[in-house]
Amino acid sequence: MVYYPELLVWVSQEPFPYKEMEGGLTKGRLPVPKEVNRKKMDEPIAASLIPPGNHEPGSPAIGYLHPF
């Protein structure tokens, strides 16, 4: 498993809004912070940090990437 600390997502422990609070959020989708959008744009750069063909001893090769 590969750990990328820059991809951490903070999840609130608060419950979903009650019916009387429904007007506080846009309908359909929750608002996405700008930082999350910026991280998605930076993702291809992070995927190219390891030069192709660089297989150090003890380092597993990554054969697939999962977009976040």
From Swiss-Prot:
**Cellular component terms (Gene Ontology):** cytoplasm
Its annotated compartments are: Cytoplasm
BP GO annotations: axon regeneration; regulation of neuron differentiation; regulation of transforming growth factor beta receptor signaling pathway
Pfam families membership:
Alveol-reg_P311
Explain the post-translational modification. Answer: Phosphorylated on Ser-59. Phosphorylation decreases stability and activity.
Q: Which keywords label this protein?
A: Cytoplasm, Phosphoprotein
Domain of life of the native organism: Eukaryota
Q: Keyword Phosphoprotein on this protein?
A: yes
Q: What does this protein do?
A: May have roles in neural function. Ectopic expression promotes axonal regeneration. Also augments motility of gliomas. May also have roles in cellular differentiation. Induces differentiation of fibroblast into myofibroblast and myofibroblast ameboid migration. Increases retinoic-acid regulation of lipid-droplet biogenesis. Down-regulates the expression of TGFB1 and TGFB2 but not of TGFB3. May play a role in the regulation of alveolar generation.
Assembly, in brief, is: Interacts with FLNA. Interacts with the latency-associated peptides (LAP) of TGFB1 and TGFB2; the interaction results in a decrease in TGFB autoinduction.
Q: What is this protein called?
A: Neuronal regeneration-related protein
Q: Which organism is it from?
A: Rattus norvegicus (Rat)
List the top taxonomic levels of the source.
Eukaryota, Metazoa, Chordata, Craniata, Vertebrata
